Amino acid sequence: MSNLVRPEKRDVSSAGIEGDFPLDVGVVEALPEGSQVLSANNYGSSAWTVTARLNVLLPNGLEKKFFIKIATGEPGHVMMRGEFNAMSALYRTCPGFIPKPLTWGKFKEAPETYFFLLDFVNMTNDLPDPVQFCAKLADLHRSSESPTGMFGFHVPTCHGRFAQDVAWDPSWPNFFTKLLRAALVIENKECSPWPEFETIAERTMSHVIPRLLGALEENGRKLKPSLIHGVLWEGNIGTDLSNGNVYVFDSGAYYAHHEMELAMWRCERHKIKSREYKRQYLRNMAVSEPAEEFDDRNRLYCVKANVIHSAHHPGSIVRETAYNDMCYLVDKYAPYPHGEEPSRSKVQGEVPATIWQGGDSHARSAHAFNIEATPTLSA
């Protein structure tokens, strides 16, 4: 759990606002001009942010609900700015797939407190319809265009509470190396020392990535930067209770190789591991060539997600999983001389070496993110 500090509780009843959420004037001023806040209530549960639902009377006389997330300090600043920009980019590309972002900003009466405001959608947390969900996701990947023609994003985005290195780069292998290296630096600070882990990670970055990802642009092939959600597991997907429309939220988006989106579908910790999701996605979006190395690329991409999960949850088994996956890839693409290879972890990975069925966790574990209690947008 983060050290998030809730904004100071203020008496809002005098302003005619019902509810238990301490509404800051900065939030009120961010709403459409002439709006009146009728109620503000804490809503949902989150490991890294405080969340609430606002009921607002618009100038045209209609009532509208908004969802708000807040976080404190410089990490909160980066999270709220990053998520607003990520969700805005997704919304511009596929508006029927994203709750509409409104704005982000800073509280005026609470120190170093930041917020992100978006449309409220009343959603169920049931697994989404695979056909609709995967068709929309593939459309996002196909139709998005990087504004620079490069991989990356114009502001840092976050995976959980940690910022990602998403600086623009024309090379996907170089971009992914920097993305993974930044994740490893964070993980090293949060977890106990493990020299063998650091050694195999360095060889993965120096030898495996150039070989495995470099092959994507061999023989005249060109890799398109696609906008990805970046943190896509079932906890960040919901279905509108009123019409069955599938939405995604809590994004850490950037422009990437589209297969990167499937990294978090690999492990056993989440229900989206179901083969049906991978099958439906690949009916809409082709695997990149060389197709025979698709599973190895997915394993590599999953290493990044597992490293960040380990940073959020020191001592988690996924650190061992990431280590064994890197050992597997090094053995296949950049083997050590006989007798010099590091030993495997005795803790086995979550998926057999011969198959993958999807799903990885977000930075929040199930016990830290009470999905059952949050049937709509959550942090």
Name what the model sees in each region.
Residues 33-39, 194-200, 286-295:
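Short, surface-exposed acidic
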Residues 23-31, 106-109, 145-229, 240-243, ...:
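An alpha-helical support segment within catalytic cores of ATP-dependent transferases
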